[in-house]
């Protein structure tokens, strides 16, 4: 992983591919490369570092009608020029780029080595191109050799290949990894992410898992399954507004996306809510009838959103809710009762562990699967029974902000819908909840316009922070701690406030920074008790509380006040406070806010 881009057409492919790769950098990278075909030459260039490094190595005179490129985030082999994509076969006749992980690469590599194939990298990707080249030398059939190669692979992959014998052809394929075609007039773009080519084409085709495409200059796209049966695919038009990569005057994408949250909430509420209840179209095609348990599966920030959903749904509905990290779910062999509902959450819709969990649910009878996703046409969206889109728009910052709070809002609304269908919430309580959530855009703007941006952490030189919260605030603390780890590079751990006395309090010494979320009125007094425990051990307490809880100043060293709101809206507002705190601390420490080290935006490998 992390990003594929390619072009075939009448224009010069080289600058187009380099531009496309630069737009994929937000997904994560440690190296980049490009391969281009001319009539008599296969040109390959690679570099470690950002795409700008690659651009400096490619001559502006280089011209080709067919090229592929890749931004890499290391999974097999350290970041290096040798391990960067594209990879070529031992005769340097063809080049390939690949996202994903080939699980049987070692077996394939050993078999090829025994036949005299020489490898030049440590990657699983090189196995694919060497395997293809070996088959092509036997058969001379480009497409058949590509199809045969794909069927030998175990794991997940999206890949693109060019061959110097066929300078007018580009081959690409996918299996449980995203790949999108952008169609123009006598030209085709390919990318892991539609936003990378949206400037040039809004007509798209999404390759489904188990499909390959044959692109020829001046010819229509041909799509097949791996058995080479022809497939007809619909062309979809995507809105250019979905692809903005402009910072719009902000210093960082993360800050821009924090400020976009009121508009995101307005979009969600417009689609989902009417004045005192739900729009008829919300989950119209999906029934909760007969559901006896819920299983929420996700990774990272999406997992934290699922944790809040458990608290919220179980507070309203008399059914159990289980929340699992996707990477553990697949291997834990959990018992899933019939008449369960699985909710899978992924911003990108391509998170490998979450998709693996989806495969497990698909093996079960009488289990319905609902997706929560931000990307139409994604693998997750295409394979669940129904998908609710969070309408967050493109999120470029690696640390999730608007997508996370959009997930929170959608999950809270889903819980209210479930409670309403099961008649476990009164019409009056439902009306008050919906009205309270409809206040979110206004309250978010109010908070973002407050003095919060003047806040500076007096403990920014500390290397370890503790976050405490109870009930609805605990999952929000978990997310805040993750944000601090991701972009400020400090150790941060979140605990239920009541658990301090059961071990973590041993970490407290004079000056230890403890950030306490006091936003849940149901457990406010209990949370104050936790503050007193750590203050007695001379901790430095930063308290986040509602504006009506000014008394918090008497027991804390610093205070951040969040506008009063409905209890279901409060976690979202407190989550935004955590985002701003992490952003501010990252600035104080001088770290890379939008592209933190070692992290990728879309984790397409397990």
UniProtKB/Swiss-Prot annotation:
One of its GO terms (molecular function) is glutamine-fructose-6-phosphate transaminase (isomerizing) activity. The active site is at residues 2, 601. It is an enzyme of class 2 (transferase). Residues 2-218 form the Glutamine amidotransferase type-2 domain. GO terms for cellular component: cytosol. Its EC number is 2.6.1.16. The keyword Hydrolase does not apply. Keywords: Aminotransferase, Cytoplasm, Glutamine amidotransferase, Repeat, Transferase. It holds the Pfam family GATase_6. It catalyses: D-fructose 6-phosphate + L-glutamine = D-glucosamine 6-phosphate + L-glutamate. Residues 278-424, 455-596 form the SIS domain. Homodimer. Catalyzes the first step in hexosamine metabolism, converting fructose-6P into glucosamine-6P using glutamine as a nitrogen source. This is Glutamine--fructose-6-phosphate aminotransferase [isomerizing].
């Amino acid at each position: 992983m992390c990003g594929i881009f390619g072009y075939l057409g009448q224009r010069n492919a080289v600058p187009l591919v380099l531009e496309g790769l630069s737009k994929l950098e937000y997904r994560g990278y440690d190296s980049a490369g490009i391969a281009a075909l001319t009539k008599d030459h296969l040109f390959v260039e690679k570099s470690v570092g950002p795409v700008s490094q690659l651009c400096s190595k490619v001559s502006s005179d280089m011209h080709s009608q067919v090229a592929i490129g890749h931004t890499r985030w290391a999974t097999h082999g350290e970041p290096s020029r040798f391990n960067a994509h594209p990879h070529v076969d031992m005769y340097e006749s063809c080049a390939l780029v690949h996202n994903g992980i080939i699980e049987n690469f070692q077996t394939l590599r050993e078999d090829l080595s025994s036949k005299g194939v020489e490898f030049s990298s440590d990657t699983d990707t090189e196995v694919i191109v060497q395997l293809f080249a070996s088959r092509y030398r036997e058969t001379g059939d480009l497409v058949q050799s590509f199809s045969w190669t794909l069927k030998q692979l175990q794991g997940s992959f999206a890949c693109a290949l060019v061959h110097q014998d066929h300078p007018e052809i580009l081959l690409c394929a996918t299996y449980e990894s995203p790949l999108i075609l952008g169609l123009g007039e006598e030209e085709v773009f390919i990318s892991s992410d539609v936003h990378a080519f949206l400037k040039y084409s809004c007509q798209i085709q999404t390759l489904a898992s188990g499909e390959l495409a044959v692109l020829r200059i001046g010819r229509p796209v041909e799509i097949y399954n791996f058995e080479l049966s022809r497939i007809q695919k619909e062309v979809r038009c995507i809105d250019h507004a979905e692809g903005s990569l402009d910072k719009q005057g902000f210093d960082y994408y993360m800050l821009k996306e924090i400020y976009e949250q009121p508009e995101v909430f307005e979009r969600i509420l417009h689609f989902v809510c009417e004045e005192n209840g739900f729009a008829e179209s919300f989950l119209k095609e999906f029934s909760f009838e007969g559901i006896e348990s819920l299983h929420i599966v996700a990774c990272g920030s999406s997992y934290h959103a699922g944790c809040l959903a458990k608290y919220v749904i179980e507070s309203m509905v008399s059914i159990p809710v289980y929340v699992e990290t996707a990477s553990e779910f697949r291997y834990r062999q959990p018992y899933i009762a019939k008449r369960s509902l699985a909710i899978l959450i992924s911003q990108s819709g391509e998170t490998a562990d979450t998709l693996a969990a989806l495969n497990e649910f698909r093996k079960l009878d009488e289990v319905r699967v609902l997706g929560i996703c931000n990307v139409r046409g994604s693998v997750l969206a295409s394979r669940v029974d129904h998908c609710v889109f969070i309408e967050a728009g493109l999120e470029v910052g690696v640390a999730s902000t608007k997508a996370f709070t959009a997930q929170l809002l959608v999950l809270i609304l889903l819980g209210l819908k479930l409670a309403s269908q099961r008649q476990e919430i009164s019409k009056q309580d439902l009306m008050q909840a919906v009205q309270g959530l409809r206040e979110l855009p206004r309250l978010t703007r109010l908070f973002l316009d407050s003095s919060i941006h003047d806040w500076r952490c007096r403990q920014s030189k500390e290397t370890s922070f503790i976050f405490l919260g109870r009930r609805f605030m605990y999952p929000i603390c978990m997310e805040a701690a993750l944000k601090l780890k991701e972009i400020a590079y400090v150790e941060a751990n979140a605990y239920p406030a009541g658990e301090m006395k059961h071990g973590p309090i041993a970490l407290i010494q004079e000056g230890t920074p403890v950030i306490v979320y006091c936003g849940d009125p149901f457990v406010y007094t209990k949370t104050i008790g936790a503050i007193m425990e750590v203050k007695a051990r001379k901790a430095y307490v930063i308290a986040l509380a509602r504006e009506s809880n000014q008394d918090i100043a008497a027991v804390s060293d610093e205070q951040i006040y969040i506008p009063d709101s409905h209890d279901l809206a409060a976690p979202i507002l407190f989550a935004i406070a955590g985002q701003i705190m992490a952003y501010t601390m990252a600035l104080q420490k001088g770290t890379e806010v939008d592209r933190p080290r070692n992290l990728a935006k879309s984790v397409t490998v397990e």
